[in-house]
């Protein structure tokens, strides 16, 4: 090959290589642009699709790194779409309850700006648990805290914080309410918020941060709801609401709500005579509630809710060791499953219980007459056998010498089962403690455990003499 042919050959090869490189660069550019726009396609859900995002939740997306010659392209995959909760897993087998959380709100109020509250409760979304309470529109170290023993004022609002975070000045006020319930359907929070005049109150239904529906008092006598979490199954949430006498016949309705809209209302049926302040839990495919009879019984009413046909059945907890306060002593108390026991029926306190096969787990004040102390235990055949009194696995949560208050249940879904947890309201101040002019609370929270556990007492712990007056 002569020199001219060599030059021509080398030139042709160089031109071919340059052309190939040119087309490769074009291909790389097209791939980069395509992946960039695909990323935005994936990250934009339909307008009617609610993503599983709360202000305190950080979505962590999996990142794929693709290398093309010298260029690095990052492709973010779409977050998994939120799904409605169905609560179809079995209930966890437990041996008792272990300490979970305590907010120490009253002790912290001695030296900080903490809200005055009452009627606390706990509820969880699929990722985190939150504590709620009805605030009094003031902090404790504030003259507006005087006379906050009154429970229905236009200044009361529903407060919401991550569990364990006391209600400080930065706390979110979810809605205006002197009675409330909250639950998460897997996609967003539903808040049921009652406020207004005693004889003409309004219940607002707030879903995903927006007011969706409302309903007016139907009996014109203090419309009220659970003061603990409602329950949602497959996108339908249910909440128990009562309007009418607190010491006589009242009108209880069970509301069914989808994304904040009331879709059905059922009237209480069955043998329960008086139902309010229910503590509800998912019992797939339905919902079960254990409530307060403020009229005839110190045994607690049960409300079973059918989420498919909206039917309601009610009766009473069978355990002869009854759960309300006031009550007779254990040797004299009774319950026969169907009717109120007509023992110390007037007044009462919010509480909870849940079935475990034929047995029942329950909590109650240690004192038979006042909201003092708190204990939990299991009653063998207490769910199915009238007047059962065989108690096992008793635990003291708050000793008899310290104050307690309302208590309620909430459920937490684990990998293989649904755990039951409870909170206890630790009331301080008026009426019992007249050294101060305010009434407020802290909380302590326990959850079911299949492990072992010790003993103790977890009272509020604030020295009333060190508190602001």
What is the predicted function of each stretch?
Residues 4-38:
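Single-pass membrane-anchoring alpha-helices
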Residues 61, 70, 86, 146, ...:
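N-linked glycosylation sites
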Residues 165-167, 213-220, 264-267, 314-316, ...:
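A short beta-strand motif characteristic of beta-propeller blades
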Residues 173-182, 222-230, 272-279, 347-351, ...:
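Repeated scaffold domains used in trafficking and secretory/extracellular systems
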Residues 192, 239, 420-428:
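Short, aromatic- and glycine-rich surface loops/edge beta-strands on solvent-exposed regions
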Residues 200-204, 249-253, 297-303, 372-378, ...:
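Structural motif
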Residues 289-291:
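Extracellular cysteine-rich, disulfide-stabilized repeat modules
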Residues 437-469:
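Blade-level signature of beta-propeller repeat domains, shared across WD40, Kelch, NHL, RCC1
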């Amino acid at each position: 090959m002569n020199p001219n042919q060599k030059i021509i050959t080398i030139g042709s090869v160089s031109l071919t290589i340059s052309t190939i490189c040119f087309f490769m660069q074009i291909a790389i550019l097209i791939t980069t642009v395509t992946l960039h726009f695909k990323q935005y396609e994936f990250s934009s859900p339909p307008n009617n699709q609610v993503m599983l995002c709360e202000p305190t939740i950080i979505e962590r997306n999996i990142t794929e790194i693709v290398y093309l010659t010298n260029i690095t392209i990052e492709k973010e995959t779409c977050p998994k779409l939120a799904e409605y909760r169905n609560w179809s897993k079995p209930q966890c087998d437990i041996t008792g309850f272990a300490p979970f959380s305590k907010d120490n709100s009253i002790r912290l109020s001695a030296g900080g700006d903490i809200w005055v509250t009452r009627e606390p409760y706990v509820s969880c979304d699929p990722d985190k648990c939150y504590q709620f309470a009805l605030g009094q529109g003031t902090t404790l170290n504030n003259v507006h805290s005087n006379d906050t023993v009154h429970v229905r004022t236009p200044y009361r609002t529903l407060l919401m914080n991550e569990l364990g975070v006391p209600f400080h000045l930065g706390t979110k006020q979810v809605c205006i309410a002197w009675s409330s319930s909250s639950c998460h359907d897997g996609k967003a929070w539903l808040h049921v918020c009652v406020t207004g005049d005693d004889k003409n109150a309004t219940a607002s239904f707030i879903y995903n941060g927006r007011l969706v529906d409302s309903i007016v008092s139907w009996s014109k006598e203090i419309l009220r709801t659970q003061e603990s979490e409602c329950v949602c199954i497959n996108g339908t949430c249910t909440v128990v609401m009562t309007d009418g006498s607190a010491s006589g016949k009242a009108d209880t309705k069970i509301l069914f709500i989808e994304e904040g809209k009331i879709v059905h209302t059922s009237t209480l049926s069955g043998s329960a005579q008086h139902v309010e302040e229910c503590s509800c839990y998912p019992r797939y495919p339905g919902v079960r509630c254990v409530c307060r009879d403020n009229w005839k019984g110190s045994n607690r009413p049960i409300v079973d809710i059918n989420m498919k046909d909206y039917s309601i059945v009610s009766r009473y907890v069978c355990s002869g060791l009854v759960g309300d306060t006031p009550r007779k002593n254990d040797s004299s108390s009774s319950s026969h499953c169907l009717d109120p026991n007509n023992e110390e029926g007037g007044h009462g306190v919010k509480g909870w219980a849940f079935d475990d096969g034929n047995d029942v787990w329950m909590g109650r004040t240690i004192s038979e007459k006042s909201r003092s102390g708190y204990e939990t235990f299991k009653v063998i055949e207490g769910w199915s056998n009238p007047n059962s009194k065989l108690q096992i696995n008793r635990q003291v949560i708050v000793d008899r010498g310290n104050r307690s208050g309302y208590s309620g249940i909430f459920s937490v879904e684990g990998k293989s089962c649904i755990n039951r947890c409870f909170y206890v309201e630790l009331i301080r101040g008026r009426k019992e403690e007249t050294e101060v002019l305010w009434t407020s609370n802290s909380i302590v929270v326990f959850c079911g455990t299949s492990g072992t556990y010790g003993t103790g007492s977890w009272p509020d712990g604030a020295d009333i003499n060190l508190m602001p007056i």
